[in-house]
Amino acid sequence: MQWIAIGMGAAFGACLRALLGRLNPLHAWIPLGTLGANVLGGLLIGMAMVVFMKAGQLWHPNVKLFVMTGFLGGLTTFSTFSSEVFALLNSGKVMAGLVLIAVHVLLTLTATAMGYYLTRLCF
C-alpha cells in the first residue's frame, strides 16, 4: 500500500510540475516553471513538516508518504534544475548559471522556512 500512496502522489506532483513547466519559455535564462515548482515544493514541505510533526498521529502513515515523498517529490525537480544550470554553464553563460543556482537555493529555502513558521503559527 505504501508504494501505491507514493506512486499516486508522485503522479499528481509530476502533473503539476508539467503544467508549471509551460512557464519556462517566458524568460530567457530563468526557467520559471522549474523555479516555481521548487519554490512551491519548498513552501509546501515546510507546511507539511509542521502538520505531520504536530498532528502526525491523526494521519495514516501512507498520507505522509503520499504528500512528502510522492507529491512533493514528483513536484520538485533537482535533476531538471541541474540540467538547466549545466546548459547555461556549458554555453559559457557562467554568471547566469551561478545566479540561477543562487535564486533557486535562496528562494526555495526561504519558502520552506516561511511555510514552516507560518504553519506553526496556525497550529
From Swiss-Prot:
Binding site for Na(+): 73, 76
GO biological process: cellular detoxification of fluoride
Membrane topology, as annotated: Multi-pass membrane protein
Cell compartments where the protein resides: Cell inner membrane
One term of GO molecular function: fluoride channel activity
Lineage: superkingdom: Bacteria
Description of how activity is regulated: Na(+) is not transported, but it plays an essential structural role and its presence is essential for fluoride channel function.
Cellular component terms (Gene Ontology): plasma membrane
Catalysis: reaction(s): fluoride(in) = fluoride(out)
Membrane-spanning parts: 1-21, 32-52, 66-86, 94-114
InterPro entries linked to this entry: FluC (IPR003691)
Keywords: Cell inner membrane, Cell membrane, Ion channel, Ion transport, Membrane, Metal-binding, Sodium, Transmembrane, Transmembrane helix, Transport
Chief location category: membrane
Pfam families xrefs: CRCB
Family: Belongs to the fluoride channel Fluc/FEX (TC 1.A.43) family.
Function: Fluoride-specific ion channel. Important for reducing fluoride concentration in the cell, thus reducing its toxicity.
Protein name, entry field: Fluoride-specific ion channel FluC
Originating species: Psychrobacter sp. (strain PRwf-1)
Organism phylogeny: Bacteria, Pseudomonadati, Pseudomonadota, Gammaproteobacteria, Moraxellales
Gene: fluC
